[in-house]
A protein has these predicted regions:
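Solvent-exposed, low-complexity, repeat-rich "mucin-like" stalks and linkers
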Residues: 31-111
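Low-complexity "stalk/linker" and mucin-like segments enriched in Ser/Thr/Pro/Ala/Gly
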Residues: 66, 100-134
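Extracellular/luminal low-complexity segments enriched in Ser/Thr/Pro
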Residues: 131-146
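Right-handed parallel beta-helix/beta-solenoid
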Residues: 168-196
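N-terminal extracellular ligand-recognition/capping segment immediately after the signal peptide
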Residues: 184, 189, 206-228, 233-240, ...
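Surface-exposed loop/turn segments connecting beta-strands in extracellular beta-rich domains
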Residues: 219-221, 238-240, 261-267, 286-290, ...
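Right-handed parallel beta-helix/beta-spiral solenoid domain characteristic of secreted/periplasmic
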Residues: 228-273, 284, 383
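All-beta strand scaffolds that present successive hydrophobic residues in beta-strands
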Residues: 229-232, 256-258, 278-282, 299-304, ...
């Protein structure tokens, strides 16, 4: 994530329904993107359907039409999200994909872009499609060179009617801010907290911030209230860390990433509490009552690392988050009383354990909600 600095000769593109003249904004024009991405259709069965493009799953299970998406992408990075066609009963607003599908003869999806502009890539989402209420489901991947694309769905009905739905997507490269111990004092938890507080005041999620931490142990609680990557080099947190709720911008999701750090407890407390999307990449979490905890609004992405010697290794108790994944990948859960707890997940969620090892735990997975669990790529676990 990083701020996009607009050249002096340019102005920031107007968002849908925006107006340069404040007076004109009091009577906004219809949103052309929303007009292009949805339609109402009366089927041969006499039922009226609301058909629209969207990205799902959405926060708290709600699905809204999406005709325009703009996002900043770090240099060399990509974004990946669902691109779907949804169908609702126009009166009850209940999902109606199955009934509408009986009226559908064929369909296709295409991507158009100006000359010289890269195109986003679409592919089947085999794992997610059965869990989704969408009529049509693809995943979309883009990089910063996909500056302006139109994703066009064409639906051909058995009646001979043809429906066109268009979602416009725009992506640009972010600029980045990197802070090292040479740039700011980072030897103590108090110094780190002061830096994080300053970053929260001066930047939003449009700025890609990386803080390179020194080889120290932070022995006081730390609260993270900004979108940031904290990259360790022998760094340890020996007191609880809390990721506070963060605000997305129009073009960036806000999240916190911990990379190659250790969370070392004394048998009590919670190592990391995530009230916003939080990545733990190649981290060690040891010696806590609860090692990592996701609560409402937050999520914990576990990608590589070791979670051992905790009362509960990782606990998911989050009914909603604007960003989450199904996969826990390359994690060794060793010698925890309970390795993984699935108390509450967002709607239609499940857990996919990919190349994980569960050994020496009292209970490998506690799943009172009965969520679906997939075991992939040699994962060793007792369910």
């Amino acid at each position: 994530m990083a701020v996009w600095l607009w050249p002096a000769a340019e102005t920031e593109p107007q968002r849908p329904n925006s107006a340069a003249d404040p007076a004109a904004a009091t009577d906004p024009a219809p949103d052309p993107y929303l007009a292009a991405c949805q339609t109402y259709y009366t089927g041969a069965d006499g039922r009226e359907y609301h058909v629209f493009t969207a990205m799902t799953p959405s926060i708290e299970g709600r699905t809204d039409p999406v005709g325009y998406r703009s996002e900043l992408i770090p240099a060399g990075g990509t974004v990946d999200f669902p691109a779907t066609v949804m169908v609702e009963d126009a009166v009850t607003q209940d999902y109606a994909a199955e009934d509408f599908a009986a009226l559908l003869d064929s369909w296709d999806v295409s991507v158009t872009a100006p000359e010289g502009v890269s195109r986003v890539k679409l592919w089947d989402a085999e794992e997610e499609t059965p869990e989704s209420p969408a009529l049509l489901y693809r995943r979309l991947r883009a990089d910063p060179t996909c500056t302006h694309n139109e994703v066009v769905w064409t639906l051909r009905m058995k009646s001979g009617d043809v429906l066109h739905l268009t979602m416009t997507v725009e992506f640009e490269e972010q600029q980045a801010l990197r802070i090292t111990p040479e740039d700011a004092p980072l030897e103590t938890a108090q110094e780190l907290q002061a830096l994080l507080d300053r970053l929260a005041e001066e930047y939003d999620a449009d700025t890609s911030i990386t803080v390179e931490l020194p080889d120290v142990t932070y022995d006081a609680p730390v609260s993270v209230g900004c979108a940031v990557t904290l990259k360790g080099s022998g760094t340890a947190f020996a007191a609880p860390v809390t990721v506070m709720p963060l605000s997305d911008t129009e073009r960036c999701h806000a999240y916190v990433r911990f990379s190659e750090v250790s969370f070392e407890g004394d048998g009590s407390g919670t190592g990391v509490t995530a009230r916003a999307p939080t990545y733990l990449e190649n981290c060690r979490v040891t010696g806590w009552d609860v090692g990592a905890l996701a609560v409402n609004g937050g999520w914990v992405y576990l990608h590589g690392g070791y979670i051992g010697g905790n009362g509960v290794g990782a606990r998911y108790d989050s009914a909603y988050s604007n960003s989450y994944t199904y996969t826990i990948r390359h994690i060794d859960f060793l010698n925890n009383t309970t390795a993984l707890e699935l108390l509450c997940l967002p709607p239609n969620s499940y857990a996919a354990l990919d190349d994980c090892r569960f050994r020496g735990n009292g209970t490998d997975v506690y799943n009172p909600g009965g969520y679906r669990i997939e075991v992939n790529n040699g994962t060793e676990v007792t369910l």
